[in-house]
Structures are given as structure tokens and as C-alpha cells.
């Protein structure tokens, strides 16, 4: 990396930080954007298992929660990972880089960076996210004040409590695809976890061919078991109560269902 780039990209650091940046090689950087419940932990572990890739899973969150560090995102986050893995051909993160930071990363890094979006079938994904909400002891982790706007728009709750507001929040997260699709190629987690050809193509496209995938590696990777499942038991049928179906119908935008349909996910019958 040239001196000019060091000045532009690391000028906010002190002298020791700039010297460290200048004298440590920076690998190709990537991120996979996802709001979760889409095999993000599995994908990060799988990428990190490749000898040419260093991949974290929202390490910035754990630095803040467990180490008391300042929360960092985007370039400030990826440059730490990159300096941690100078021998890797590609380095990045799954689930820890916000979609809002992508334009800045592209502007700063150009062809030395790439991004992908990871999704999953909407309703099973929602069920997994709801299981996380239910099982997590600190409900205030998520800000649900904003869902009042849905209540004001006649989305009915059987009881106005944090669990039901978290449901509305989870439903609204399905609208994220509207903002994600224009940012980067969208990949289905169902394909990456089961199809070796798709996984190999994903890795090579994500790393702009810095990493070439052997078929045997992809075959082994897709045999890796699921990790960090939020929903331990199969969902009972029907999966949603009437008020929840009504909320899904009112909150998820038609544009979101259209995008999911293009991705090959069937729109729920109750939407039509």
C-alpha cells in the first residue's frame, strides 16, 4: 500500500498506529452483510476454515461487550482484521459490518474490497429471529420504540409488551432486503450450506478470485453441521397466530416480497 494511501486511510491514527499500518501488508478485504438468522455463524466458520481466508463473525460486537472496547464498524473494523491477518489472501467478516458503511468502504478501497448480502427464506428466518428474541435474557438489547409507528398505523397487538413489540421489529427486519439488494449480490444461505458449486462460486466472487476453491474443499464444507441455531425445535404448525399474520401482511412491503420472489422464495399464501 502506497504512502498516499496510508495517509488517506490511516491518517486518524497516532504515530504508532500509522507506522503499524504502513509496515504490515493488507490482504484483500470483504464483508458479508446480513441481519442474522441466516447461517451467518456457519458461513463465517466455513470461510475461516479455508487456509487462505481469515474471517470473523461480528467480532466488533464482542470486543465492545466483552472487552469494553469502543464499537467500530466499516473501515475502522476491517482494517483491524486486515492487519491481524497479513498472510491471508483475503480477510473479512460476516454479520459485523453494517450496510450503511458499504459505500464508504467501496470509495476507500475500490477493487481491494468486495461485499455480498446473505439471506434466507423469510418466514423460517423470522421464526429463528423470534426464538433469539425469546431466549435472550436482556430484551432491551434491541430498540423497539420505533415500532410504535406500526401500532399507530393500526397494527394490533394482543398485549403491548416488549415481546410483542420485538415481533413487530423482527417482521420489519424482513424489509431490509429492499435496502440490501441494491448494495451487492444477494446469496441464499440455503444454497451456500448445501451446494458445493454455489459455495465455491460465492467464495471466488466474494474474494474477486484472490481465493480459488477446490471442489473437494467445497464438498467438505457443505457437510459441516449447522452452528448456533436459535430455534432448537421444529416450529409447530401453524407457525403464526392470526394477529401475527395480520402484522406481517401490513408491515412487510410489497417490494420486499417481490424481491424474495425473484430470489426463488415463495410468497406466503396469506399475502395474496
Regions found by a protein language model. Give the residues of each.
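PAPS-dependent sulfotransferase catalytic core
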Residues: 1-89
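Glycine-rich phosphate-binding loop used to anchor ATP phosphates in small-molecule kinases
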Residues: 85-104
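PAPS-dependent sulfotransferases, especially Golgi type II membrane carbohydrate sulfotransferases
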Residues: 1-25, 162-163, 171, 175-179, ...
